[in-house]
């Protein structure tokens, strides 16, 4: 199931989202913003977990930063915001995906790997570019900056596959989820969810106090920074030697938190 999502439905969802969207060049600034928010959270997590054992550090690094925007936030945005804000979500997600679609996995292998890495730059680059979702986002950003549009036939072809991505990503998450959680493992989940909530509070303050955007964009970005952990994080956790089942359980809790936050935002800010 994970291979289907990683190599087929998620890349098609990315291609369709960008191919079907119209946006102004100024909105491309959302790409570095999405990356900065995700990478900033990763750096903080790195700084506060130096004494954690290797598997636990991989668990925190891969699940504390970044957001599930394509499978979770985008449907909410399409329901309560204008089509332009849906495009903004896709652009923000492009920056977010630099970490979620391979960046965090590559860096975590370097930081919490089981053996010494002889060529760290080559190691990170290999992990990054071996991630098909990352390659797809990178290609789309380059084409967008160059003003090249995807062929309408390709957009139409990817639409039914893209529509299946949300269901398959959530189904994959359900297959990985572990409901047998001891007190010690539950404490790790509580720390992770608390850390993500703290990041969301800080990022919300940055959005409302520091960014020169209108209130509609602020409301959108608030929804995005309260979105749940990436649907890919449990798989990357397992691939990095961490507890993939526990990551799946924690992911489900962040989805519940995200639904509550999105509902409150829709009722109060939109």
Identify the meaning behind each predicted range.
Residues 2-270:
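Alpha-helical transmembrane segments of multi-pass small-molecule/ion transporters
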């Amino acid at each position: 199931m994970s291979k289907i999502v990683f190599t087929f439905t998620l890349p098609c969802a990315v291609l369709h989202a960008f191919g079907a969207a119209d946006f102004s060049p100024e909105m491309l600034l959302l790409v570095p913003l999405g990356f900065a928010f995700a990478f900033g959270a990763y750096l903080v997590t790195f700084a506060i977990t130096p004494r954690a054992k290797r598997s636990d550090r991989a668990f925190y690094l891969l699940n504390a930063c970044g957001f599930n925007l394509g499978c979770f936030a985008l449907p909410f945005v399409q329901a309560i915001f204008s089509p332009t804000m849906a495009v903004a979500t896709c652009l923000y997600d492009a920056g977010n995906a630099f970490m979620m679609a391979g960046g965090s996995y590559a860096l975590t292998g370097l930081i919490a790997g089981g053996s010494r890495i002889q060529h760290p730059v080559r190691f990170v680059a290999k992990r990054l570019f071996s991630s098909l979702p990352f390659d797809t986002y990178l290609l789309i950003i380059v084409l967008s900056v160059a003003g090249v549009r995807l062929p309408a036939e390709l957009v139409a072809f990817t639409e039914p596959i893209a529509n299946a991505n949300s269901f398959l990503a959530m189904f994959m998450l359900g297959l990985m989820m572990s409901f047998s959680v001891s007190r010690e493992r539950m404490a790790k989940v509580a720390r992770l969810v608390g850390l993500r909530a703290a990041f969301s509070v800080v990022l919300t303050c940055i959005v409302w106090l520091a960014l020169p955007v209108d209130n509609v964009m602020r409301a959108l970005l608030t929804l995005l920074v309260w979105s749940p952990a990436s649907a890919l994080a449990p798989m990357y956790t397992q691939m990095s030697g961490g507890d993939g089942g526990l990551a799946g359980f924690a992911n489900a809790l962040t989805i519940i938190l995200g639904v509550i936050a999105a509902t409150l935002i829709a009722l109060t800010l939109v």
